[in-house]
């Protein structure tokens, strides 16, 4: 009962802070205070989704830059910035370039793990979808701070020894329903198999969630991977300590209140795979913290992966919505 009450109080206080960000009384409440990062953090990553940059809406560019400025001020080193898709609103080249340039100028993380979303591929109207994917690759290669080069919009990378695999819509005539070629399935399987013997958690970043996880079927019936879902899940379930990070359905960060009322959570473990669904950074969310600016600070330790809820726009922590996932 107290946990549910804290959830409600946290929502009210956080809403007031968006209106009165400099209130000393509100900022002093224990419910939003930051617990110090524990000793022994092996990987520290900021994870967000659905940024929806549009050069015709400059306030959105400012909101993105403001959140990255919060990361830049972090007293703890941020090893990676992870964005799980919908980097832009309409997939136009100018907005994609703006998204990347804002990150490049912020110097907020040593590594980037960036996935394309349906708004970056499926919603492209002024050029072929493959051209949009190649422009994404070129910007990543030219600007990412680690200097790493990728050949395709789906790729793998290692950060502090941890394997990350990024997936993408391979289709040429898709909108909101992604398509994946056989080559990409094989790439996912091989990339996880290659790193599995390290005994470390592995992370798969894909904009669209697999079917039926994190409340996708209740929130947006057609908002999952569709025909690709079973194949992707069958690969994920072959390996231990896999974390699947998605966005797309604009679900707010939530906790016991939503889980008890609706039967799902933004962090779930199903058949041994850990599924994390992120809110939209730029737009209103449902079934959880509703406003934008939200994401997780993901801290990896020897025995757990800790997801600490944070509003990067208002520089506030939401400890009542933290999730700890044990490493098996």
Which sequence ranges carry the predicted segments?
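Gram-positive cell-envelope targeting signals
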Residues: 1-24
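N-terminal active-site segment of His-dependent metallophosphoesterases
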Residues: 23-96
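A short C-terminal boundary segment appended to hydrolase-like catalytic domains
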Residues: 29-31, 36-39, 289, 293-328
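Active-site neighborhood of phospho(di)ester-bond hydrolases with catalytic His/Asp-centered motifs
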Residues: 47-49, 81-86, 112-118, 204-206, ...
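Solvent-exposed loop/turn segments at secondary-structure junctions
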Residues: 51-54, 87-90, 118-123, 170-174, ...
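Short, flexible/disordered intra-domain loops and linkers
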Residues: 56-60, 124-132, 214-225, 256
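Extended active-site neighborhood of metal-dependent phosphoesterases/phosphodiesterases
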Residues: 93-196, 231, 237-238, 254-283, ...
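Active-site-proximal segments of metal-dependent phosphoesterases and phosphodiesterases across multiple
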Residues: 174-179, 195-246, 254-260
């Amino acid at each position: 009962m107290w946990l549910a009450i804290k959830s409600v109080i946290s929502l009210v206080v956080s809403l007031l802070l968006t209106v009165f960000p400099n209130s000393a009384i509100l900022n002093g409440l224990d419910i939003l205070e930051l617990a110090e990062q524990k000793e022994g953090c092996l990987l520290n990553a900021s994870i967000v989704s659905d940024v929806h940059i549009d050069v015709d809406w400059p306030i959105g560019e400012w909101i993105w830059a403001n959140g990255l400025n919060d990361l830049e001020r972090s007293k703890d080193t941020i090893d990676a910035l992870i964005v799980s898709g919908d980097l832009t609103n309409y997939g136009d080249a100018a907005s994609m370039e703006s998204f990347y340039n804002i990150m490049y100028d912020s110097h907020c993380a040593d590594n980037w793990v960036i996935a394309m979303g349906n708004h970056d591929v499926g919603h492209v109207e002024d050029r072929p979808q493959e051209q949009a994917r190649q422009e994404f690759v070129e910007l990543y290669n030219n600007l990412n701070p680690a200097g790493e080069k990728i050949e395709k919009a789906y790729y793998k990378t290692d950060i502090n020894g941890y394997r990350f695999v990024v997936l993408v819509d391979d289709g040429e005539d898709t909108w909101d329903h992604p398509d994946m070629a056989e080559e990409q399935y094989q790439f996912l399987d091989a990339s996880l198999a290659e790193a599995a013997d390290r005994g470390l958690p592995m992370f798969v970043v894909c904009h669209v969630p697999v079917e039926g996880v994190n409340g996708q079927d209740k929130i947006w019936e057609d908002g999952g991977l569709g025909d690709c879902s079973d194949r992707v899940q069958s690969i994920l379930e072959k390996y231990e300590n896999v974390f699947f990070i998605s966005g797309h359905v604009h679900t707010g960060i939530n906790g016991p209140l939503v889980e008890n009322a609706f039967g799902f959570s933004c962090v779930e473990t199903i058949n041994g795979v850990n599924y994390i669904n992120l809110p939209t950074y730029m737009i209103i969310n449902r079934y959880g913290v509703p406003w934008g600016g939200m994401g997780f600070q993901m801290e990896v330790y020897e025995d757990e992966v800790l997801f600490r809820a944070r509003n990067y726009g208002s520089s506030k922590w939401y400890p009542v919505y933290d999730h700890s996932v044990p490493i098996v």
